Swiss-Prot record:
One of its GO terms (cellular component) is myosin filament. This is Paramyosin. Residues 1-26, 837-863 are annotated as: Nonhelical region. It comes from the Eukaryota. Homodimer. It comes from Echinococcus granulosus.
Amino acid sequence: MSESHVKISRTIIRGTSPSTVRLESPVRELEDLLDLERDARVRSERNANELSIQLDTMTERLDELSGTSSQTQDAIRRKDMEIANVRKDLENANAAFETAEATLRRKHNTMISEISSEVENLQKQKGRAEKDKSQLMLEIDNVLGQLDGALKAKASAESKLEGLDSQLTRLKALTDDLQRQMADVNSAKSRLAAENFELVRVNQEYEAQVVNFSKTKSVLEGQLDDLKRAMDEDARNRLNLQTQLSSLQMDYDNLQARYEEEAEAAGNLRNQVAKFNADMAALKTRLERELMAKTEEFEELKRKLTVRITELEDIAEHERTRANNLEKTKVKLTIEIKDLQAENEALAAENGELTHRAKQAENLANELQRRVDEMTVEINTLNSANNALEGDNMRLKGQVGDLTDRIANLDRENRQLGDQLKETKSALRDANRRLTDLEALRSQLEADGDNLASALHDAEEALKELEVKYVASQNALNHLKSEMEQRLREKDEELENLRKSTTRTIEELTTTISEMEVRFKSDMSRLKKKYEATISELEVQLDVANKANASLNRENKALAQRVQELQTALEDERRAREAAESNLQVSERKRIALTSEVEEIRSQLELSDRARKNAESELNDANGRISELTMSVNTLTNDKRRLEGDIGVMQGDLDEAVNARKAAEDRADRLNAEVLRLADELRQEQENYKRAETLRKQLEIEIREITVKLEEAEAFATREGRRMVQKLQNRVRELEAELDGEIRRAKEAFASARKYERQFKELQTQSEDDKRMILELQDLLDKTQIKMKAYKRQLEEQEEVSQLTMSKYRKAQQQIEEAEHRADMAERTITIKRTIGGPGSRAVSVVREINSVSRGNRATSIM
């Protein structure tokens, strides 16, 4: 230390001052900082352009979503119109079924009454035939009786002919009714065939759409798997970060132990070193808390995604079961499905974009985390550099103490130095006041240090340049170079072991921080007591100097000129000290500026985290909409199945109608055959009547033949009567069976009506689901607008950051100019005093030592 002082003193005496060289390196460093600030401004402008591009894309998406909402509203209006049409069709079908049932009942009642009347007539005819038989048996004995019997037979045959004519007319009317029913059945068959063809076509369209939806679902499932893999990668990155943090903690513990060893050797100034270490430890713990918070956020996000996946699977299974009940609505939902398909494509594109943005946000978070780790390493490096500079500060303060002793010895030689000592006392008081101001400034710097992490992203390149500046400062401080190189080598060797555990050292770190805080407080109290003791000692020395000055006043008249020279030298020293203090203030302001920049970097990091969280929320919203689309696809699949079942039921109804038609045709054929048979019988009866006329003319000749014919007629009438009764009974049974069939068809019609009512209710629920989907789209639109506002706000904040950076650069440049001006003034003053010999040259060398040490400390603080 003494050799360096001698070297500096000799240099001053020779007239070669290195202040210019020392000032050039801070100027170059500030120019580098200016370049870095320009680069940061370019990056901020680039970020602003990117944010404006994102704002334009979000505006376009907002327009697309508004168009999609209008299309959805149109689809809902069309669906309401279709529901009204279905309701009208249902009412018309119910009315038609009721009228058809009433007419069928009336027809069956009339047919039953007619058949019963015919049976009664046949029974009456049978009775008449028996009476005729008895009369003919009586007329065998008497020809006249036979003639009367023949006349009665003629009358009965005529009445029978009239009955057969009336029966023929009734059968014709029944045939006409059956033909009309057959025509109605044919029309219903054609209508059902057309509906069947339409249902088949719609079914094919739905099958094609279901295939498309299945492909979309597979794509979305692949995206979900990608997200799961990304979450696993994030977990692995988190584990790597924890190992890195543990290794950094171990490095910090080693450095702390080394620092304590140096603090024991350093003496009273160890408290300040502990203070700076406490500040760095607080910053490190804050970064660790932020890292743990981010880790917990990643774990919570992973857990939420897992729960969401299970919920989506359950919802998908539930919606598959629900979809089986909605397949019958495919005919009226074709237009809506096309609209939904277009919306699905838009949502798929949006989902892809959101997934890409989420991946970008995750990459950005990983990059920021890596930068935080690099910043932590560089902060540790700067901490070690700060420790070295504090050692220099201790040595400089020791030199200041030596200079104070020299000043006291010089004051003892002259009584006029008492006033100078009083001024020195006031200067020391000012120094104490400045110390309190510096402590307040330190507290302010600590508060500003909390805002330092927000500017990490923009200060990445600046911190790399700081590392280069640190190397330059090592070159400037040659007496510290070997020690710093050794520490750097040790740090490089220890960096390989700084990545294993973090939970083991967190508690030790907290205890160390608390101990360092207690140590800092105790050191501050000791420093305060030391300065108070120094002040008291200076007061005692002042009294002694006053006494010595009173005794030396008589002896030092010849030294008056020398005292004046020493007084001027002391004034120069005071001015140099003030210049050093101003330089210290400049360096403190620069430190505050750098602290504010780090706080801005931290705020930008928080903004990026918020953007990542927003992207994750958008991804969750997109996943919810994907699940809703999956449910709608399953619903449409179930609608398809239900419509296929309805088609099968309608096909069965069509087969039944065809069978009924065939049965009606068979009945019509049987009735036609019966009409022909009755016509033949009528002709036979006419022939019998003619034969009876001929028999009446030949009664006397052919009595036996008439008897035989009468017996044959009796047998024929009995046989035909039995046959007619049996035939009519069969007809009654057939009509009863037809009545049962019509009743069954009426019940089926009522069942189909209830089925249509259920379909109507299902359509209502579907329309409500569509309305709910529209509300969700509106909420998504509102969220998008909020995000646009947030992006605009971030853009404004980036502009404010760039403006603050330029203002800081202007302030730094102004401070550099002021420092250069003060350095020039000091060099001119030293040049003036250089020609003075004797003790004056020694005072100038002392002043030069103080200036050189203070400027070296200022250059180190700037770096």
